[in-house]
């Protein structure tokens, strides 16, 4: 995980997108490959911190099987941070897909993509005289990302109501 995370994120995505054939599945696989180290690090950190808690140590001392400890104590306490992190990764991945499609390295034109829609509005005449070509996809990207971030905030508040918000 550290090796993948040591490379700049956008550079790794661009190089991988340039190597593989542009398309929906290649973008999904590339973004999944680049994003998995963050999830792995989050899960590992949560499991290591939960391993030191009294309720897990109590189960170990009581002789509970490892499967019971993992599925009834550690997994339920690890799901919440993963869901919250997944919403931010989803928003970032949507921006990355739009950027790659805008550059022509993502989803190809017969398939609809917000990046492809923005790609059609690159000339200054289109930008100034035809805002209906680029304004709706641009606004939609902003609305989608902000909405997903609101969902992530709501999930964080739902899983941790005393999370410091006043």
Give the label of every model feature segment.
Residues 1-166:
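Alpha-helical transmembrane segments of integral membrane proteins
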């Amino acid at each position: 995980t550290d090796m993948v995370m040591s490379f700049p994120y956008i550079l790794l995505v661009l190089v991988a997108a340039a190597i593989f054939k542009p398309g929906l599945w290649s973008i999904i696989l590339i973004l999944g490959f680049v994003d998995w180290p963050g999830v792995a690090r989050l899960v590992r950190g949560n499991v290591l911190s939960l391993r030191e808690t009294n309720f897990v140590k109590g189960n170990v001392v009581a002789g509970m099987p490892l499967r019971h400890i993992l599925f009834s104590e550690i997994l339920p306490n690890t799901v919440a941070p993963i869901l919250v992190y997944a919403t931010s990764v989803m928003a970032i991945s949507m921006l990355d897909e739009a950027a790659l499609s805008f550059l022509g390295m993502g989803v190809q034109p017969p398939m609809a993509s917000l990046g492809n829609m923005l790609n059609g509005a690159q000339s200054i005449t289109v930008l100034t005289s035809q805002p209906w070509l680029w304004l709706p996809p641009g606004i939609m990207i902003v609305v989608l990302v902000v909405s997903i971030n609101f969902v992530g905030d709501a999930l964080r508040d739902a899983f941790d109501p005393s999370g410091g918000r006043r």
